[in-house]
């Protein structure tokens, strides 16, 4: 599974790298985190977490600095979090998390993306109950047992630790993600491939042929919206 998460990040970074969308989305997220607390990552855990994720996605330093500088100013721009759940082809399920300054615009755009690309937006809660929220940490290593023991000693609520092809994947309770990252740093881990809060499907579906093509277009349409921050789904090997 570790390679799966690393591949997802690499795939998304490569796809988004052709545009500035990924930079803009992280810019908003960094701005909000800095505005809601101290604009100093050493004094603001949420801000430090977002900056670390931005660096994993290869967001340039000047983009990060610009967002923090904006938060230090007198701007009153307000962003609101949202979630939109829905369905794609052949049993596929999708959760879309947004961060927007215009909820009506975002809701209309997400609904249109679903409707025009073979999907159907559902009611709140129609999909999310079939997903589990977890912290996911991925880094280089091969001794899962040792990592598990280190996290337990640090009183981190760990769901699972997996080792695969030189990569360790740690699943934590969502509230213990930051604690898990710090515990691993304290034990010598210097670089992380993934540090994310994820919605993990309880079961996955396999799509092929036209269904897979339709699903890919739907995901691309959702992710291309400037207000969409994260898209989760239950399709295997995608």
Swiss-Prot record:
Signal peptide: none annotated. The keyword Transcription applies. Gene3D superfamilies: 1.10.10.200, 3.30.70.980. GO terms for molecular function: DNA binding. Keywords: Cytoplasm, DNA-binding, Transcription, Transcription regulation. GO terms for biological process: regulation of DNA-templated transcription. InterPro entries: Integrase-like_N, TACO1_YebC-like_2nd/3rd_dom, TACO1_YebC_N, Transcrip_reg_TACO1-like, Transcrip_reg_TACO1-like_dom3, Transcrip_reg_TACO1_YeeN, YebC-like. It is found in: Cytoplasm. SUPFAM superfamilies: YebC-like (SSF75625). Transmembrane segments: none annotated. One of its GO terms (cellular component) is cytosol. Belongs to the TACO1 family. YeeN subfamily. This is Probable transcriptional regulatory protein SPy_0316/M5005_Spy0269. It comes from Streptococcus pyogenes serotype M1.
